[in-house]
A protein has these predicted regions:
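Flexible phosphate-sensing "switch/lid" loops adjacent to ATP/NTP-binding sites
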Residues: 2, 6-157, 161-167, 172-285, ...
Length: 310
């Protein structure tokens, strides 16, 4: 939930504009048959369906595919790298919430979240990534408390005083903001952000408030099956519905919970189009968010200095 994926998308677009062929390699999410998943390549939405991706995997892969960037994942990360090297000039390691890069990189960009000040020095592997970084992106400065931004900046500098620090906003985009105004809404956020990410809300909640929803309805009375179990395990989740989908049963429970909810519409802050995998009986507005650097240097400045135009 810090903004790693949107940062990777921004980096990939810059590198492509510079003339480079780019692929993203995601850290492992081994939910299925690990033998079949030795090397996975995703270039189309059909690839996601054929390889039986979970919602969590789709949340990471779909935005890259939307931008025309090939995604690799799987189990054998040397074999994955060797295949990616055959078709691209630059590999982007897209991960970090559960690990640090499996590859020795030429440039390490680490995202810090001022909505969770202190996590950058108190959590593993975040603290390790801080020490390895060449560049920090302090994201969401447009919605964080100024004192928290300062605290994160000071913490990063104390652990890694030579790294460059970029501040960035995370502006929200909704297809029809007026559709939200005055409505009773169900807010959905990506599951990992709310659960092991420890966030109480995400982009969907911010958009619902910003665009004038009359009420954010508590989804818990409408929850079924595994969604009930998720709320018990992560009670801080509160009035937001986590888009849990680690298997077919969970996806069905998510669909039933959404369709049970007595609301006017759904505001979805997940990075994917949920309607591709579930049938929803009420209107849905997707919230999109991109990285917007503030001031200089920008990521483009740093990437051009490091790699130059092809």
């Amino acid at each position: 939930g810090s903004g790693k994926s949107q940062t990777t998308r921004r980096v990939s677009l810059i590198l492509r504009d510079m003339g480079y062929r780019v692929a993203a390699i995601r850290h492992p999410m081994p939910y299925g048959n690990l033998v079949k998943q030795k090397v996975q390549r995703f270039a189309t939405y059909d690839d996601l369906t054929k390889q039986e991706c979970t919602i969590e995997e789709r949340e990471e892969y779909e935005p890259h595919i939307d931008n025309g960037v090939i995604v690799y994942a799987g189990v054998d990360y040397e074999a994955i790298l060797r295949q990616a090297e055959q078709e691209v000039d630059i590999v982007l390691w897209d991960g970090g919430n559960n690990d640090f890069s499996f590859y020795v990189s030429d440039l390490s960009i680490v995202v810090a979240d001022p909505h969770r000040p202190g996590h950058e020095v108190s959590f593993h592997p975040g603290e390790t990534n801080v020490r390895l970084a060449d560049v920090f992106v302090i994201n969401k400065v447009d919605t964080a408390l100024p004192e928290n931004v300062i605290s994160v900046r000071d913490n990063l500098h104390s652990l890694n005083p030579t790294a460059t620090i970029i501040e960035a906003a995370s502006p929200l985009f909704v297809d029809d903001p007026e559709a939200i105004r005055g409505k009773r809404v169900l807010v959905i956020e990506d599951g990992p952000t709310l659960t092991h990410g420890g966030m109480a809300y995400g982009a969907g909640w911010v958009a619902a408030r910003r665009f004038g929803a009359a009420e954010i309805v508590d989804p818990r009375p409408f929850a079924v099956g595994s969604i009930i179990d998720t709320y018990r395990k992560y009670p801080k989740t509160g009035t937001i519905l986590p888009a849990m989908g680690y298997g077919d049963e969970m996806v069905k429970d998510l669909e039933k919970t959404i369709n049970n909810a007595k609301v006017d519409m759904v505001v979805s802050g997940t990075p994917i189009d949920l309607t591709r995998i579930i049938k929803v009986n009420k209107p849905m507005q997707r919230v999109r968010y991109e990285l917007q650097e503030i001031g200089k240097p920008t990521l483009e400045d740093i990437l051009k200095q490091k790699f130059g135009k092809k």
